[in-house]
Amino acid sequence: MNEGKTQDNEEKYGLIQAFKLLVKNKYYMMICGTYILQQLYSAMIGAGLFYMTWVLKNKNLFGWFAWAVNIPLIIALIFTPTLVGKWKGMYKLNMRGYMLAVIGRALVVVAGYIGNVPLMLVFTAVAALGQGPWQGDMNAMIASCSEYTYLTQGKHVDGTMYSCTSLGVKIGGGIGTAVVGWLMELSGYVGKNTTQPQSALDMMQFMYLWLPLIFDVLILVILSKMNVEAENERIKLQRGIGSDIRHEI
């Protein structure tokens, strides 16, 4: 019944008004920015096929690196709810997770330059394990952002906010695909050639080793400012509102 009430309230908003409500929520903008960076990260990891083929000279390694990403992510997703409870919220978990991810990707860079593939696989898995909690609690974070909009502006935007978060995915995915193509073209890469110029090989290293690390650092910076749970509690305490407000609205 409360859910129907929320939907009715949201239906009264025009597209422009809903957009203004979302833009005024700094935490929502942070989530969108993080989504875009995640998609750019994924695009560079996907471009790893070029790196495996031309730098490591074994395109079959791409499948192994895919496993090194996916298995730790699944493990992290399983344990995320427990860790959220243990650390009393998502902020600390997300921060610690991405600190681990940054360390992992930094060590991937080191292992890449010394040419140690087993170490690259291990540190890729470490980075993925650190990224998992954020992927596991994203929806809960969006719910907290929606609560922040209600607390600060008195408006329900739950449905709109969930729908619009796909914006970051679409924008990031489109930009990521385009950037991969542009960078490879600028480097002088020609797919039909049996050999590639050094400029292309250097670009492949930059795209697969350095850009994912840079994107993880940027995401960590954003997450360090995304303590929306604490902000919501501060506002509710200031106004004398119960902590179970989400169940009442």
Listing of model-derived features with the role each one plays in the protein:
Residues Q153-G188:
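A late C-terminal transmembrane helix in Major Facilitator Superfamily
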Residues I75-K92:
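Helix-to-loop junctions at the C-terminal end of transmembrane segments
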Residues W182-I214:
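A membrane-interface helix-boundary motif in multi-pass transporters
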Residues N70-I78, G174:
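Residue-level signature of mid-helix packing/kink "hotspots" within the transmembrane helices
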Residues V110-T124, W134-A140:
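Helix-loop junctions at membrane interfaces in 12-TM secondary transporters
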Residues W54-P72, L119, S199-M207:
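Loop-to-transmembrane helix entry
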Residues M1-K59, M204-M207, P212-I249:
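Intracellular loop-helix junctions on the cytosolic face of multi-pass helical membrane proteins
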Residues M99-G115:
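C-terminal ends and interior cores of transmembrane alpha-helices
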